[in-house]
């Protein structure tokens, strides 16, 4: 059973309560993320120390909005950790996207889906994904019930010490994601902060704008849904993006670009065997499921 954490108030107050309730888990994840970064760098021929990670965190932290920094500071204070440790735990995926360009790396990760109302059993939109996370992260996963002083309430799945990963808010907006690795990755706003900002919005346009804001660190694929039935898949690089409205049927995405224009940002030497196989397999399995599509059918298709 996942732990549920209730947060309310200002960004700092919510962060501090987050850190206080999950202090041990935040410490565990922060230490683990440093070790994962070191091991990833070593595997790709790049020497890396914890001190270097901390210095990168200090440099890049200030690129984020004040409310996000305040929440990270609250988490750090609540868990009695330096804010650099909290930030680096949040930033590992984007850090790896910048680092991977120094050497070849297999493209693996999550598989996501969008199902339009005309294809779902109850005529409601469906949105979801797998989560290709290290098994060691399971003890630090939590559900966060967020009631901010300003903005809609939200229900979020994430890891201890981190911002939004997957979630839905009371305005009927929901977000998900899977990773992409463009060649223009650079220090900038990390994807968890973008998702966090998107779920703080109360309308479709502002949520999409939050995900495509200037200054992104790397590329990600974002899923956006609205209770009224509107769905879109947003592919991004650090500096470019493309939006694919999903008005009918189903849409599957893995970890390579489907946009012809954005494929120019992929390294032609990267190993895409996993992501391309998963895309075709998910499409085949979903096509084989009984219609209309149900949540149970989606779980079976992705199992």
What is each PLM-predicted segment?
Residues 77, 84-125:
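Gly/Pro-rich turn-and-neighbor structural signature
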Residues 1-79, 117-126, 130-303:
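C-terminal, well-structured catalytic/ligand-binding subdomain of enzymes
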């Amino acid at each position: 059973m996942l732990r549920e954490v209730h947060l309310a108030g200002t960004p700092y107050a919510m962060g501090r309560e987050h850190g206080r309730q999950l202090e041990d888990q935040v410490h565990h994840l922060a230490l683990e993320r440093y070790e994962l970064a070191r091991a990833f760098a070593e595997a790709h021929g790049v020497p890396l120390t914890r001190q270097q990670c901390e210095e990168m965190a200090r440099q890049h932290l200030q690129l984020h909005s004040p409310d996000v920094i305040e929440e990270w500071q609250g988490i750090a204070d609540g868990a009695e950790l330096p804010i650099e440790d909290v930030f680096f735990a949040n930033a590992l995926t984007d850090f790896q996207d910048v680092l991977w360009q120094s050497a070849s790396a297999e493209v693996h990760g999550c598989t996501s889906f969008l199902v339009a109302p005309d294809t779902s059993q109850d005529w409601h939109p469906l949105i979801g994904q797998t989560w290709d996370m290290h098994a060691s992260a399971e003890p630090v996963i939590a559900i966060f019930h967020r009631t901010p002083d300003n903005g809609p309430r939200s229900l979020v799945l994430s890891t201890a010490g981190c911002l939004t990963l997957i979630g839905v808010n009371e305005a009927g907006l929901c977000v998900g994601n899977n990773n992409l690795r463009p060649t223009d990755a650079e220090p900038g706003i990390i994807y968890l902060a973008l998702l966090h900002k998107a779920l703080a919005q109360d309308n479709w346009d502002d949520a999409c704008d939050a995900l495509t804001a200037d200054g992104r660190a790397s590329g990600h694929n974002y899923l956006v849904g609205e209770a009224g039935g509107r769905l879109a898949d947003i592919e991004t690089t650090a500096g470019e993006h493309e939006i694919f409205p999903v008005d009918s049927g189903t849409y599957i995405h893995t970890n390579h670009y489907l946009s012809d224009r954005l494929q120019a940002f992929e390294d032609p030497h990267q190993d895409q065997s996993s992501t391309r196989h998963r895309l075709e397999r998910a499409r085949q399995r979903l096509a084989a499921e009984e219609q209309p599509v149900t949540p149970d059918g989606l779980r079976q298709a992705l199992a």
